[in-house]
Regions:
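Conserved N-terminal boundary motif of the eukaryotic protein kinase catalytic domain
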Residues: 84-92
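Amphipathic alpha-helical interaction surfaces in cytosolic regulatory modules
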Residues: 3-76
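ATP/Mg2+ or Mg2+-diphosphate-binding catalytic cores
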Residues: 316, 331-378
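Short, glycine/acidic-enriched loop or turn micro-motifs at the edges of active sites
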Residues: 32, 160, 244-246, 263, ...
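An alpha-helical support segment within catalytic cores of ATP-dependent transferases
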Residues: 191-242, 246, 252, 370-372
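Active-site activation/catalytic loop segments of kinase-like enzymes and analogous catalytic loops
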Residues: 273-313, 327-346
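ATP-binding pocket architecture of kinase catalytic cores
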Residues: 91-92, 98-197
Length: 378
């Protein structure tokens, strides 16, 4: 956009904006812009002053450099164009609730998110991965946000490792060894205090919002019951993964590493363990496709892991803690539907059809158990 066309472009934009009526936010897609002059810069400055929620997206590197060098990136929202990656369907490594993972190169993988996933959700995952890394948790190095066709993706280093699920499948005789490592990973994480004022979110607040979001699928009575359970969990400041099933732990040498960091938060360990139990023991959906091993193995590894996690406690106390964890899992079995608006309708219906049996018919028991949550101090 040089001086010869800037005036004409400004006139066209102004005439279009007049037809729009009240404008709350204005976004300029600059994907076709290869050059911008001082007149073009002044035009964007005028737009940013006229529309407080003004942003420019898909800016090519050379143009972004101009915006950056002139200080415009400090006074308005300007986003670089994302690097485009192409993937081979045959390079698929795994699939989770909100994305599919592919090998991108000899050194990297890319997690491709479902259609409908927002840039904010993608940025949150890469931010949480970096925050957990800084706090001392073993995680893959995260590189960049990319595009794969029309979808967003995250590029990570390729770990020369196997998922914990794969290790258990291949060596079930080492179940106790793997369970101990799994428990150590939880304990390592739950010993980390998350400092106030950082970017890691409050897991309790997020879980409450997720349950309230279910009002589109469940009636008010059902939502209130789930809220009653969740809001009974004590507050906490410990680092939580919130989706640490065995397919989200990678065995690299003798060390387990965390992947899939989109739900990282802080709070009470009961939230984290309840989420994991809902995947490892009571998952709805295709268990082997999601967890990566038979349900029988999942139950075995959970029972052994929780015994190691609470090592030194009496069998009665471990059973009590497991009952508390199971109560929280009854909510997570359904609240995870809020992670995406594009889950298959058949899966949504399966969840709804199981709700009465799993939750409503056990209402009194679940509420009674939730009243004991306060005895779990950290």
């Amino acid at each position: 956009m040089d001086s010869s066309v800037a005036a004409e472009v400004k006139e066209k934009i102004s005439s279009q904006l007049v037809l729009c009526g009240r404008i709350n936010s204005l976004t300029c897609d600059a994907s076709g812009l290869t050059y911008i002059s001082s007149m073009g810069l002044r035009m964007t400055l005028q737009l940013s002053k006229s529309y407080p929620n003004f942003s420019i997206i898909e800016v090519q590197p050379d143009v972004y450099h101009v915006f950056d060098m002139t200080g415009f990136t400090k006074i308005m929202a300007i986003e670089k164009a994302l690097r485009q990656l192409s993937i081979d369907e045959n390079s698929k490594i795994g699939e989770g609730g909100i994305g599919v993972v592919y090998r991108a190169s000899d050194d990297s993988i890319v997690k491709v998110f479902r259609e409908g996933t927002t840039m904010d959700q993608v940025r949150n995952e890469i931010t949480m991965a970096k925050e957990a890394f800084v706090l001392g948790m073993p995680t893959p190095i995260s590189f960049d946000v990319v595009r794969v066709g029309s979808r967003y993706g995250l590029e990570y280093e390729l770990l020369h490792a196997e998922t914990l699920s794969t290790c258990i499948n291949q060596h079930p005789e080492r179940m106790d060894e793997y369970a101990r490592k799994y428990a150590q990973l939880f304990r390592q994480m739950h010993h980390i205090h998350v400092p106030k004022g950082g970017s890691i979110p409050d897991s309790m607040a997020r879980e409450e919002a997720a349950v309230r979001h279910l009002s589109r699928n469940f009636d008010a009575k059902s939502v209130d019951l789930m809220l009653g359970i969740i809001l009974s969990i004590p507050k906490g400041d410990r680092l939580l993964h919130c989706d640490l099933q065995t397919k989200n732990a990678m065995m690299m040498g003798d060390e387990l590493m965390l992947i899939d960091m989109g739900e990282v938060g802080y709070g009470h360990p009961l939230i984290d363990l309840g989420h994991a139990y809902s995947a490892m023991v009571t998952l709805l959906g295709d268990y082997e496709a999601i967890v990566g091993m038979p349900r029988e193995y999942g139950k075995q590894i959970w029972d052994k892991m929780i015994a190691h996690y609470f090592e030194g406690e009496s069998p009665e106390m471990i059973a009590h803690r497991n009952e508390q964890i199971a109560a929280v899992s009854c909510v997570r079995n359904f609240s995870w539907l809020s992670l995406s608006d594009s889950f298959p309708e058949a899966l949504v219906q399966e969840c709804k059809s199981n709700f009465d049996e799993r939750v409503m018919k056990r209402r009194d028991h679940l509420l009674a158990v939730s009243k004991t949550f306060d005895d779990w101090t950290v």
